[in-house]
Amino acid sequence: MVKLHFSRNLRLLKPDHFAFVFQKPKLVRIQQMVILGRINTLVYPRVGMIIAKKYIKLAHERNHIKRLIRESFRLNQHKLCIMDFIIIAKSGLTKMNNFDIIKALEKLWHRYYRL
């Protein structure tokens, strides 16, 4: 049975973790989000988020989007390649409803599924 947890080691926490992904990322984008990915040396995928106040003004909206991203990653982590991911939110994301955000994330994750 697959464990669907989201522990601390599944997150990018330090600036050098983010810098590693920014050096040579594989880029997938839609209008409201961008996912940068880079193969890591670990045995599990990790995710980091950049949700700028410039694009999403209200804190509760930023937190809501982070929760949706974490939940989507948690449910798809066993299907993903062993990579570090950074999700960057763009303007217009708050105008989307939950279903559309989750559907967009599924579409983005699908590009990084294991074969």
Swiss-Prot record:
Which Gene Ontology molecular-function terms are recorded? 3'-tRNA processing endoribonuclease activity; ribonuclease P activity; tRNA binding
Q: What class of enzyme is it?
A: hydrolase
Sorted alphabetically, the Gene Ontology cellular component annotations on this record are: ribonuclease P complex
SUPFAM superfamilies according to UniProt: Ribosomal protein S5 domain 2-like
Q: Which GO terms describe its biological process?
A: tRNA 5'-leader removal
Key words, A-Z: Endonuclease, Hydrolase, Nuclease, RNA-binding, tRNA processing
Gene3D superfamilies documented for this protein:
3.30.230.10
Q: Which reactions does this protein catalyse?
A: Endonucleolytic cleavage of RNA, removing 5'-extranucleotides from tRNA precursor
Q: What is its EC number?
A: 3.1.26.5
The family assignment reads: Belongs to the RnpA family.
Self-association and partners: Consists of a catalytic RNA component (M1 or rnpB) and a protein subunit.
This molecule's function is given as: RNaseP catalyzes the removal of the 5'-leader sequence from pre-tRNA to produce the mature 5'-terminus. It can also cleave other RNA substrates such as 4.5S RNA. The protein component plays an auxiliary but essential role in vivo by binding to the 5'-leader sequence and broadening the substrate specificity of the ribozyme.
Task: Name it.
Answer: Ribonuclease P protein component
Task: Tell me the name of the encoding gene.
Answer: rnpA
